[in-house]
Each structure stands twice: as structure tokens, then as C-alpha cells.
Amino acid sequence: MKKPILSLLILVFLVINLNAQRKCAVGDASDEKLKRRHEILNTKLQDYYQKYDKQNIFVDNLIRIPVVVHIIHNNTSGKIGGEGNNNISDEQVFSQIRVLNEDYRKKISTPGFNNSPVGTDMNIEFYLADKDPDGNPTLGINRIYSSKSSFDVFDENTLLSSLSYWDSNRYLNIWVTTLKDDFLGYAEFPVGEFDGLELEEVDEAIDGVMIDHRAFGSKTGTSTNGVYTHGRTLTHEIGHWLGLIHTWGDEYCGDDFCNDTPPTESGNLSIKCTPKYSNCRGTRTLNMIENYMDYTADSCMNIFTNDQKSRVRAILEVSKRRKRLITNSEFNLPQTEKLIVKVLENPSSTDYLQFQILLNAFANFNYEIFDASGKQIIQASFEDSPSRLIQIPKIDLGKGIYNLRVKSGEEIVYNRLISQ
Ligand SMILES: [Zn+2]
């Protein structure tokens, strides 16, 4: 049946309005501060590439990122889940974590898979934190009531953090609430550290992602209607948190500093995934509307590229706060009030002598192992380290009784190690 053109136009107009347009506050090009931060970050990365051999630095290890989800809701009854309730269900949170892992691992048989030669498995996984900042078991979900019905992404991030926050050196904080002005989400960028450059590190307390509950999770709870309900807003925002820039570089035919994402005139707001083209630098090219760092509808997205991965890996090496978070996650040991050394199973029944070094903050420390005659056999130093596990192969020591000396700042702890 032939439809009147007028009603078709009205329908399209309504659909667009009902779904709103993807609005990621990071792309607000009028914000000079953000733009400057992009420039600083890229200058530093270029230095980094020159300083080190790229091949040797980027080990493709699996990175696991602990996430804490703060649900800031205005539901006085405290009821969890249900239609329109911004005190969203645990299931909605779980659906979001699942999507992150599908997208960042390019999982086969999921919407996060692609066949593109430049499409990559980022080799990054996300999990709800299993220990709170005091080391107690947790689900990684905090529910906080606030009488405020919505929050402004630019002016009220500190307020949001004051309601609930875990150390951003150890957790990726995600604040899920109702955002003002149709924004879907906002993320803070990482920074690197190089000599000779001054950097404005963002306040620890707001380092994370803010996201509207209606764009959080996949087809679950309050995230069911519209084109931004497949969980890709958070995939996109965490891309920023890891240092990625929009594919059009936040300006007309701008640069995202990745060579395998084609030049793009501007963000694509397509909700039907139809091909889009750009005419940048005198050449007509197909836009990569499927890139997570574009503005297309969730269902169009399924790709991070090899260069985006290289960029993220470089940033994770140089960004102090991100590196701390990843290292801490690797060991997942508690902070203590003072330096404590715990020798595990002494003598050990395995091929290793193992001891935990528990610190009260990220700190420098060294350990030395001496034989019975007082001769130093092994020593190692660590900088800006969280509490960590040390494993010494018995074969490196031989049988005997050894003295272990651990020093961090002014604190020194001695222990005896038995190697049998
Ligand atoms: Zn964005």
C-alpha cells in the first residue's frame, strides 16, 4: 500500500524526537577545556611513541577493570526496578556489564562481533567489584536516594560524587541517574605523565562515567524503548574514559588520531544504520558508522579498530590513575594501616615462596632476601605500587633458611623464609 508522504515524514519526525539524538557531553566542542585536554593527551602520546619501541611496550594482556555502579535515584519508597523507576534493578546492571564484555572482547555470536579486518578484540573485561574499599565483600552496586530528580552533567558531577564515590585509583565509578538536557552520558578522560608538560589532572572524585538510566543496560528495566537501549552508550563513554576521541575529532573532518578510522565530517546521528559518506581532504570516503565512538544508534555499532586499541594501550601505560587501577585489580589485595608482610605457607608446598606485601597507599617499596651468612641473594624494587603478591621460584634460592627484608618509606619489616 502506498503511504501518503506527509504521514511518513511525521512518523520519522516523531521517531527521532521520541528517541532523542545521541548526546554525549564529551563531544561538546564549545568546551575549550576538553578540547585542550585532547591536544595535551595527543602530544604526550607522540612523545611516548618516539621514546619507546611500540612493539615492545604493548603487550596484549587481558586487562580486567573493576566497576562500581552508583544508582542515584529519587524513589522515596526505595522500591527497586519497575517502569520508569530510576532505582533500576540489578538485572539492568548485569545486562550492561554483559554488553561491555561482548563489545570490548568482540565476542562471537553477540552484537559486539564484527568481521572487519580492522576490527579488534580490545582484550579488556569489566566486572562488578567484589570487594569494597575496606576489603569487604560487595555486589559492586550502591543505591543512594537523593531528592533531586535529575543532574546536570557539567555542573553537578561533584554533587553526584558527594552522594556516593569509591577511590577512582581502584575502581571505575559509574553514576547511573537521570541526566538533564537529554544527555545520555559523560566521561572523564585519562591523562598521561611526561616530563616538560604541565597537566591538569581531573579531580579524583569525579573521574568516571555519568550515564542516564534509560540508556544504561540492554533491553531491560527502564532501558527498553528507543535506539539507545542496547547498552552501547556505556561502551562509548568508557571509550572516552580509556582515552578515545569521537571518530570525527569533535570538529568538521577532525582527527581522532587513529589511522584506520576514515576521516569523517561529523558525528552520524543515523538511527537506521544507512551508509554515510564524507568529503574530507578532497576524497569521498565511507564513514565508519559502526564504530563505538560515533553517534549512531546502538544497533549500528560493533567495532573498535586496531589503532584505537594501540591508542588505549599506550594511554594505559602512561596514565597514572588508570595504571594504578589495573595493577590493583591484578592483585586485588587490601590496603592496611601500616606495612604488613604476610608469608603464605612457610615452608611452601609449591615451587614458589610467596608473600603478600600490604601497603597503606600506592607506594614505593623494595624487598631483599639474604642467606644465613647475610649475603644478599635477591632484591627488587617497585614504584607507585598497590599491595601485591610476590612469588619467588624456589629454584632461585635453593634449600635453606633465608631472611626477608621489606622496606617502604621509613617502615621496615623482617621475616624468615624457609625453602625446602
Ligand atoms: Zn562521546
Residue ranges and their predicted role:
Residues Q354, Q376-L397:
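Glycine-centered tight-turn motifs at strand-turn-strand junctions
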Residues M301-K338:
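A recurrent domain-boundary module in secreted/ectodomain proteins
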Residues G217, G221-N302:
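The catalytic-center signature of Zn2+-dependent metalloproteases
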Residues F154-H246:
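Active-site-proximal segment of zinc-dependent metalloprotease catalytic domains
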Residues K3-P4, Q379-E383, K399-Q420:
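C-terminal tail/sorting-segment detector
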Residues Q21-S168, T178:
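Propeptide-to-catalytic entry region of secreted or membrane-anchored zinc metalloproteases
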Residues M1-A29, L100, L389-I392, Y414:
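Bacterial Sec-dependent N-terminal signal peptides
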Residues Q335-N360, F370-K375, K399, L417-Q420:
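Surface-exposed, proline-anchored Ser/Thr-rich loop/turn motifs
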